[in-house]
Amino acid sequence: MTVAIAAFTPDRLPAMADRWVEAWAKAYPAIDFAARRAWFCDRITALAESGATVLLATDGEEVAGFVTVDPATGWIDQMLVGLAHQGQGVAAMLMETAKRLRPAGLTLDVNADNARAIAFYRRQGFATTGQRLNDQGRAIALMAWRSPPPAERPRS
């Protein structure tokens, strides 16, 4: 496996949607994510058109994962790694790239019952800053990462 970070191009949207549907369907099998595929495609297109940075993790020609970052606010609207690439460092690679893009800080929300994602974000230095309910009444954790302050230089 050789994963690289690449810029979003519209021709990759179907593969991104495939990864999104398969991962979310596994996490929440009672929800029909295939029926939400068009929403996802519209969402990614709107984010890209509004100035968000959309980055892909690619393994050869395959889309392994993706992250979106609003460079003005640091908001991560979408982050996902496909099932075949989970647990292989792809998410960490995407997050490190997002941190370099927005060293002032990043924010995101995550389903509060998604223990695996929350543990990943905590390992990446994110802290829980609050909680809210989404439109379906599901608890959502709000999380933020701030770049550590520069180390002080020794005084001479």
PLM-predicted stretches and their roles:
Residues A7-A84, M95-T97, L101, N134:
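Acetyl-CoA-dependent GNAT
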Residues A92, D113-G130, D135-A139:
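Conserved active-site alpha-helix within GNAT-family acetyltransferase domains
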